[in-house]
Amino acid sequence: MILIMIAIDNKLLTIEHVSREGGSHTMPAKHYHEGYEIYYLLEGERYYFIEDRTYRVRKGNLVLINKNILHRTIDTENPDHERILIEFHENFLKPYSKETKDISLYSIFKQKQFVYKLNVEEQLWLENHLFKMIKEKKSKNKGYVSYIRLLLIELLIYFNRQLKIDSISIVEYPDPTHEKMAEIASFISKNYNSDLSLKNVASLFNYSSTYLSRTFKQVTGFSFVEYKNNIRIKEARKLLQQTDLNISDISSMVGYNNLTHFGRIFKEITNYSPLNFRKLMSMKRSSK
């Protein structure tokens, strides 16, 4: 089993190289973050739930996740796999912001296409580049942090150039059941502030509550309630950061009628109370 975990510059960048065999390897349900994510599958297959749909990701596929996008990897029939994962905050590349003004490095993450099927040449280039980053951190030669920054910039420029080529195709739904659950997830995302119950949504889509509960969990990796709460809290985070609305109003706007319940769910997902989260975001803005 390969397990390499690297953190650089106060965790503004982390790199993981993991090979897993046997047993379940579904990632924790609460997963979206302030940084960008690059996920490359070296071996095996995974289901990857992103926002409101599930993709079957295969060997040689690349996944790019923007900031604050809800996502989760899920086991396929065979959970064995090997992958490299990079998570980074844009502040990691801030020292080179002047030198990269001629290109929008992060634009590729803002596309609605998340999963890319790379050809053999692109796979070889990417694998060589990722292992070069890992090797550089292990060696810790003089200037290694600066070099890793430059390697990451080169990687992002490569993505912005290559991933616009028409021959690179998106990986679609694994099967009709996944597509139907994606439709339901999309419905929840668009109507998160309504009184959504499992029973009502199941009835709307002509399913029994038991079937929807079981199948939604299998396909997305989230229970119905987990997904609904994550969508609501994600929207609440935006409102706390971008507006001066009071917390009670925000609670109602995202679908919670009980302020105490809202506070408990918010802290469960973010590890902060709504008030402390707002203070933290305000401090971060002031320090820029």
Model regions and ranges:
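Generic protein-terminus/edge-of-domain signal
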Residues: M1-L62, I69, E77, K98-L105, ...
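A hydrophobic/aromatic-rich effector-binding and dimerization subdomain
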Residues: I2-E21, I74-K138, I157, R161-D166
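Regular secondary-structure segments
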Residues: L42, E127-K138, A185, S189-Y192, ...
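Short hydrophobic/aromatic patch on the recognition helix
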Residues: G60, Y211-F216, H261-F262, F266
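Short, Lys/Arg-enriched, Trp-marked, Pro/Gly-tolerant hinge/linker segments that flank
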Residues: K112-E122, K137-L150, L156-K190, S194, ...
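Terminal helix-turn-helix DNA-binding modules in bacterial transcription factors
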Residues: S186, K190, D195, K199, ...
